[in-house]
Design a protein with these regions (language model features):
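Short alpha-helical transmembrane segments in multi-pass integral membrane proteins
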Residues: 1-28, 85-157, 207-263, 320-385, ...
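Transmembrane helical elements of multi-pass membrane transporters/channels
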Residues: 26-45, 153, 187, 220-224, ...
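Generic alpha-helical transmembrane segments of integral inner-membrane proteins
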Residues: 32, 36, 40, 44, ...
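Hydrophobic/aromatic residues within transmembrane alpha-helices of membrane transport systems
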Residues: 33, 45-49, 60, 85-90, ...
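Helix-terminus/linker motif at the lipid-water interface of multi-pass membrane proteins
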Residues: 36, 40-58, 127-141, 199-208, ...
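Small-residue hotspots at the loop-to-helix junctions and early N-terminal turns
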Residues: 54-65, 147, 151, 214, ...
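Small-residue-rich hydrophobic transmembrane alpha-helices
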Residues: 57-117, 161-180, 281, 292-358, ...
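Short runs within selected transmembrane alpha-helices of multi-pass transporters and secretion channels
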Residues: 78, 153-172, 180-188, 213-229, ...
Length: 469
């Protein structure tokens, strides 16, 4: 009798009805599809480079890891101004929107110029940081050569990427979400097509290998920028902020100060997190060049499967956030419990599929047996920890939906720099343990976050309406 009551209580707390799951999936599935398309194309892109050799693949993956830090810097840089853009648009203050756009422009220009100068002066040294492990002198020299070739071309794609982020973020904050998505899909198709033509030299196109992959990426970014910028200025009736946008590039000092106060923590958080991910990869790379190749393979595969817990986590922020805004705290807590349980359950099923299929994915790449074997086990380890990551992601967005941004900052950037990176740094440099054990230890450390997240969610520190207060 007692056991029946416990089962009934568990079911009521963590399992919803059909209507509940339909509501959750209605929010989560479109996010999964959008992220799924992007990550699947990235997988195909990665496989194309991976088919031409280990050194080419490793060189490109190292550069992409470094450019990823720049990408998130830009994202963080424009996000702070975006808070003001949305409010100005809500007030129909188009001049205010123009001013926030100009702030984004200057912030992005400063970050982009700084990044280009850094890569031109110390780019080779940054790539070399990932080549300190095992491998023959020839393999290391080839990886550095291909990485430098890839980087030199990819730098040409930073300005259009910058402009796309400025325009697309402003359009979204003004309610236009479809055009940036369409432009992104076109860019993906252009990238995929020219990757195939230029990497392998199909038809009358030259066989350029890793340089072809970089050219295809840069070309796709200019196409995306042309679509977004062109559409914005051709449809000024929809985009009133575009009228007289470049009549001046001055930004009022008081607005600049306000945006810096709100936006600097966001920029800081994104930069810290991205640089920590780059540092983790560098720590693993101490164990040899094959580790760089295997991480590239496993991370690309992981990204395809991770769309499930990422989409469900985003859904928590949307659905629970709306309930908090409506002041229905009881329903918000009940919904959150069920959504966290649903996310963990879904990701446990996905993890099983991922674990079973792990030996097959590395076979798609033209690399050596050691790199394939490492990639297989890295994918298996990630699959094992996927339910943990699903729980973490859901609790992270639960706390953020209640406005606990300081806690989420501690969760995100501070934890990875104070716990994960030191573990990887010490174990990779001062012990002889296998890289797979180091990787697993870093994943295992996230259990600390799980415990903290569980306590905070259970205590209900996130149950607040930040709009009315």
């Amino acid at each position: 009798m007692e056991r029946t009551k416990e089962r009934s209580s568990f079911r009521k707390k963590f399992i919803g009805d059909r209507k509940f799951y339909m509501m959750v999936l209605a929010v989560a599935v479109p996010i999964m599809i959008q992220n799924g398309i992007t990550n699947f194309v990235s997988l195909l892109d990665n496989i194309m480079i991976g088919r031409i050799g280990t050194e080419q693949m490793s060189g490109a993956s190292i550069v992409n890891q470094l450019i990823f830090v720049y990408n998130l810097c830009i994202f963080g840089g424009v996000s702070g101004a975006g808070i003001f853009t949305a409010q100005y648009f809500g007030q129909k203050d188009h001049e205010g929107v123009r001013q926030t756009f100009r702030y984004k422009f200057w912030m992005a220009v400063i970050l982009t110029i700084g990044t280009i100068l850094m890569f031109l002066t110390v780019g080779e040294n940054l790539i070399s940081m990932y080549l300190q492990g095992g491998g023959t002198a020839q393999q290391i020299a080839d990886t550095l050569k291909y990485g430098k070739q890839y980087l030199d071309i990819m730098l040409l794609g930073l300005p259009p990427f910058m402009m796309v982020q400025i325009y697309s973020s402003t359009l979204r904050e003004c309610g236009e979400t479809v055009l940036p998505m369409k432009a992104g899909v076109v860019a993906i198709c252009v990238n995929l097509l020219f990757n195939y033509l230029l990497i392998y030299g199909v038809f009358f196109f030259p066989r350029l290998g890793v340089r072809g992959a970089a050219i295809a990426t840069v070309l796709s970014r200019y196409v995306e920028a042309a679509i977004v910028i062109g559409w914005t200025h051709r449809h000024t009736e929809k985009n009133a902020f575009a009228k007289g946008l470049y009549s001046t590039l001055k930004v009022p000092a008081n607005l600049t100060k306000k945006i810096l106060v709100k936006g600097t923590p966001l920029l800081f958080n994104e930069t810290l997190w991205a640089s920590a991910m780059a540092m983790l990869t560098q720590c693993y790379s101490i164990r040899g060049l094959n580790v760089v190749a295997s991480l590239n393979i496993s991370n690309t595969i992981n990204n395809v499967f991770n769309i499930v817990f990422i989409a469900l986590g985003d859904s928590v922020a949307i659905i629970v956030g709306q309930l908090l805004g409506a002041g229905d705290m009881k329903k918000a807590r009940d919904t959150d419990n069920k959504m966290i349980a649903f996310s963990v359950m879904c990701c446990t099923c996905v993890a099983m599929v991922m674990f079973v299929m792990a030996p097959l994915f590395p076979m798609l790449y033209n690399t050596n047996d050691e790199a394939r074997e490492l990639a297989k086990y890295l994918i298996m380890i990630t699959a094992f920890f996927m339910p943990q990551n699903a729980f973490l992601h859901a609790t992270y967005f639960t706390l953020r939906s209640g406005g606990k941004t300081i806690i989420t900052f501690l969760f995100d950037s501070v934890f990875i720099w104070c716990v994960s990176v030191p573990i990887a740094f010490v174990l990779s440099r001062y012990t002889g343990i296998h890289v797979l054990v180091i990787y697993a230890c870093v994943q295992l450390a996230d259990l600390i976050k799980c415990v903290i997240g569980f306590v905070l969610v259970k205590k209900g520190v996130w149950l607040q309406n930040i709009v009315s207060s």
